Design a protein with these regions (language model features):
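Bacterial N-terminal signal peptides
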Residues: 6-15
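Beta-strand-enriched cores of mature, soluble protein domains
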Residues: 21-168
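Positively charged n-region of N-terminal signal peptides that target proteins for export
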Residues: 1-4
């Protein structure tokens, strides 16, 4: 019985190795800088404790963005949804609009998880952004994968600074 099981395991692992060896290895992704934005936030609204954690929301008050091929303003009126989880991490989901200098309005939905490092310091915050652009000059944004890096923004106003990168 033991030899039958050992034989079956050996056959499965040998087959899996042979199959894996025949397949091409996916290329490592690279990043291309797209733009940096400074997003101003209004005073947050505490929703309270929910079954998922401590919920709050912060209205997006506006801002600016600039990159090599795209720049403009962050429109007021969006929201940054925040959930403080039981493990101390913060789930973030921002939904807002940007308007390019040439008049195109683009929806941004940006999500992240912000956690502290084991020594209690703020850890790096990486985001995943989805853009919804109208057909035309910026519709390439609808077909790409984007990640971002988020840090606190200008100390004079409550804001965050995010650098967006296209994954290639």
């Amino acid at each position: 019985m033991k030899s039958a099981i050992a034989g079956a395991v050996l056959a499965l692992t040998t087959s899996a190795s042979a199959i894996a060896a025949d397949r091409p290895v996916p290329p490592d992704p690279t990043l291309e800088f797209v733009f940096e934005e400074e997003v101003a936030l209004s005073a947050g609204v505490a929703v309270g404790t929910t079954p998922y954690g401590g919920r709050s929301i912060a209205p997006i008050a506006g801002g600016t963005f600039k990159g090599p091929e795209i720049s403009g303003t962050v429109l007021p009126g969006g929201w940054d949804w925040q959930l403080l989880r039981a493990d101390g991490c913060l789930d973030l989901k921002a939904d807002y609009f940007i308007k390019t200098d040439d008049g195109v309005t683009i929806n941004v939905v940006n999500t992240a998880v912000a956690c502290r490092t084991p020594d209690g310091k703020p850890g790096p915050v990486r985001t995943h952004a989805v853009f919804e652009a109208p057909n035309g000059k910026y519709d390439w944004m609808n077909r790409q994968t984007f990640i971002g890096s988020l840090v606190p923004g200008d100390e004079k106003v409550q804001s965050v600074r995010i650098r967006f990168y296209r994954v290639k």
